[in-house]
Curated annotation (Swiss-Prot):
Organism: Staphylococcus aureus (strain NCTC 8325 / PS 47)
Region (DDBH2-2): 293-401
Official protein name in the record: Replicative helicase loading/DNA remodeling protein DnaB
Known function: Helps DnaI load the DnaC replicative helicase onto single-stranded (ss)DNA. During DNA replication from the origin of replication (oriC) in the DNA replisome, DnaB and DnaD are required after DnaA and before subsequent helicase DnaC loading. Component of the replication restart primosome, which reloads the replicative helicase on sites other than oriC. Essential for replication initiation of the chromosome and plasmids. Remodels DNA, laterally compacts supercoiled plasmid and linear DNA.
Region named DDBH1: 3-113
Alphabetic keyword roster: DNA replication, DNA-binding, Primosome
UniProt-annotated stretches for the region DDBH2-1: 200-292
Biological classification of the source: Bacteria, Bacillati, Bacillota, Bacilli, Bacillales
């Protein structure tokens, strides 16, 4: 997994627009379906197709597009959406732009024109990754599909008319403003701008073999970076590749460089070609940042994380399963109707789950939400402190009014028997009058059950904070 859904503060209500400076034709679809699907999967390619419908709608300033569309129509949460977007961005088919202000966050997604089959198969990284995914026979079947019989023109002479042979040259010069006409941005391949290669060391090594540094042109540098990234070559390994790829005219053969680099890799890796693999959460950049922060429960960083995390993603993490449609609808209702922040909703849902044996009764949740809204609770920290406060036991007189309504305040004497989260375990001790009513045997068993639950819950909080 790459970036988390909350890395850019991505929320369901955030608006988006889609840009596309080309016309998607059947050739593009063939390349996407046949060549890119084995690399990034059907979900990512399907998301690319799905987003094309919003290009024209994005020109309508009165039409508001939000990320609820992806969640509702594709039946995915924002974390899954971000994972598929990561694949499209990394493979070079999409660019993402974001703008934050005090009121809202807006995203612009730019669809990039897929390359031609010729460019795809000539890309040293894409072609190798495809070969690794589909193996030898299927790779050549795909390649053959895009081939066509060319007419041999070697014995023909071109007799095409030039423009000036047919038309008069205009004498009047007209200045035309074309700044508003979008430029068809071609496919640039896999972006390796954040990858570095020691070209200075390579230059020194080649100099010892009396090889001119002029041989490493701009295009050669691009290919060297691609091959070094693909095959994990150092400056010394690249030196051997280059020395074996120089033609009799003292020029670099790019085709030979690719062959030499491939052979070098195969010898080092028991004839196994490199595969396209998605980084695991432990090695991804976003996970690295998360591990550095590693917020502890009740810390400012922990509250900030709750404010940024989608409640749907939180539910998926807590229950280790996809939230149901009714649960997603309930979260959307809390956001839209009650205007609650992510942090408040996350505290609310965790509060209810831990008190209701991991269940989420909608009526109960909406009643709490309504009360919290009336109390003016707007942040995760405020919700946390208030949840601790209302969870404290109350005597018979003070709780009687709430018992009739079945409110979440009406904990009465059974409060000490409720399942309690770690951050709610510090309560006021019950009064002597209340304690006298309890049976000592029941108290002992209750304390054992309570401590066992708190031990289990503490472990859960520690796991979630990592």
């Amino acid at each position: 997994m790459g970036r988390q859904a909350f890395e850019f503060g991505l929320r369901p209500k955030d608006q988006f627009k889609v840009m596309q400076h080309f016309d998607l034709n059947t050739n593009h679809l063939e390349v996407l379906n046949r060549l890119y699907t084995p690399l990034i999967g059907t979900q990512a390619v399907g998301l690319y197709h799905f987003m094309t419908q919003f290009v024209k709608e994005s020109h309508n300033e009165t039409l508001i597009l939000s990320h609820y569309i992806f969640m509702n129509e594709l039946k995915i949460n924002l974390l899954e959406f971000r994972q598929q977007m990561d694949l499209l961005e990394a493979i070079g088919l999409l660019k993402a732009f974001v703008k934050h202000d005090e009121q809202e966050t807006q995203f612009v997604y730019q669809l990039i024109q897929p390359p031609s089959a010729h460019l795809f198969f000539n890309d040293p990284m894409l072609s190798i990754f495809l070969y690794s995914e589909v193996e030898h026979r299927r790779f050549h079947e795909l390649k053959k599909y895009f081939e066509y019989q060319q007419i041999d023109l070697s014995e023909f002479k071109q007799v095409t008319r030039q423009f000036t042979d047919v038309f008069k040259v205009p004498s009047t010069k007209i200045d035309i403003d074309t700044s508003d006409i979008p430029i068809n941005e071609p496919y640039q391949g896999i972006d390796l701008s954040n990858e570095s290669f020691d070209f200075e060391m390579l230059r020194q090594m080649l100099g010892k073999h009396f090889i001119s540094q002029d041989i490493v042109t701009k295009d050669a540098k691009r290919l060297i970076t691609q091959l070094a990234t693909l095959y994990g070559l150092t400056a010394d390994g690249m030196k051997h590749v280059i020395l074996n790829s120089i033609t009799s005219g003292q020029q670099l053969s790019f085709e030979e460089m690719r062959k030499q680099a491939r052979s070098y890799y195969l010898m080092e890796h028991e004839n196994q070609m490199p595969k396209l693999q998605v980084k695991s959460p432990a090695t991804s950049s976003s996970a690295g940042k998360s591990s550095e922060v590693n917020p502890k429960p009740q810390s400012d960083e922990w509250f900030e994380l709750l404010e940024q995390t989608s409640p749907i993603d939180m539910l998926a993490s807590w229950s280790e399963s996809e939230p149901t449609i009714s649960q997603k609808t309930m979260v959307e209702e809390l956001i839209e109707r009650e205007k609650m922040s992510f942090g408040v909703i996350n505290i609310l849902l965790q509060f209810v789950m831990l008190k209701e044996d991991m269940k989420l009764p909608k009526a109960y949740i909406l009643e709490i939400a309504s009360n919290w809204k009336k109390k003016g609770i707007k942040t995760a920290k405020e919700a946390y402190n208030y949840a601790k406060k209302v969870n404290q036991p109350k005597n018979e007189g003070s709780s009687g009014n709430y018992q009739k309504r079945g409110s979440y305040y009406g904990q009465r004497n059974r409060i000490s028997k409720e399942k309690t989260p770690k951050w709610l375990e510090n309560r006021d001790k019950p009064s002597e009058e209340d304690s006298a009513k309890d049976n000592s045997v029941d108290d002992q068993q209750l304390e054992q059950d309570r401590q066992a639950f708190l031990d289990k819950l503490s472990k859960k909080w520690e796991e979630d904070s990592q």
